[in-house]
Amino acid sequence: MITQILLTQTFIMFILMILGLILSKTGLLTEHGSKDMVNILLYAVIPCVIIRSYITDFTMEKLYGLLMSAVLAVAAFAVAIAVSYIIYGMRKPIDNFGTAFCNAGFIGIPLVTAVFGNEAAFYVASFASILNLLQWTYGIVIITRRKDMINIKKVFVNPVTISLVIGLFLFITGIKLPGVINSTMAGVAALNTPAAMIVLGYYLSCVRIRDLLLNPSLYLASFVRLIIIPLLTLLVLYIIPAGHGQIGMITLIAAATPVGTSTAIFAQKFGQNYERAVCMVCLSTLLSIITMPVVMYLAQMWIM
């Protein structure tokens, strides 16, 4: 059942990517427009998704589940960072960053909610928050090779962290937002999948097919990101008792997502190989249509 849902959702995402590619090729979506869409996603859509996920009745069971999801997320990232560093070290910063940090926000959250319902975003939000924290600390060191480039303000003052704090406050206090605000946030949150995939389609239109499909090193990076890291994460979840059941599956879905779009954003921001980063994002996203359902099929036998 989970595999079938994932297969359907990843195919929908593929269609949306093609739509983005067509819009770009016909001149209806420009570079400036794609950057605006990324800003809308980062500063409006993702915060609405996270805050809405915490608008639920407080129970100790949910609090325990939230803490366990954070612990499992740390374990998953420990695997990803270790594998990426062993394979790439500091000599290939884009490959290291891209394989270590997945697309939990734009792909993981919508896939998790499609499989387990909107309430499951409650748990995957902690994964996205830890991802954000690691990107702005360890990720900066990878990209720049300089520890002094870490911006403490951006680590804690960013849309993901702020929305997480607001969401936790609403969850713990039990404060309910007015219906009109909740409905508005729901509408904005619904943009997550289509907007993110259309942007990825734009990225796809910017690369040469030859560069994308005939570069063995890109396939290696995709193999690391989509196969090695998810399977090792699955093994860790199998060993840890708390890794079994729904929270374990939620963690694995997020951990099995392709190279994050943040790889391209960080590469551009810090003067690294932006074109390679875009190729990594696009190829791994296309291949994830096949790999994610396969990984989840194996996971159902191991941790469900």
PLM segments and residue spans:
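Alpha-helical transmembrane segments of multi-pass small-molecule/ion transporters
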Residues: 1-304
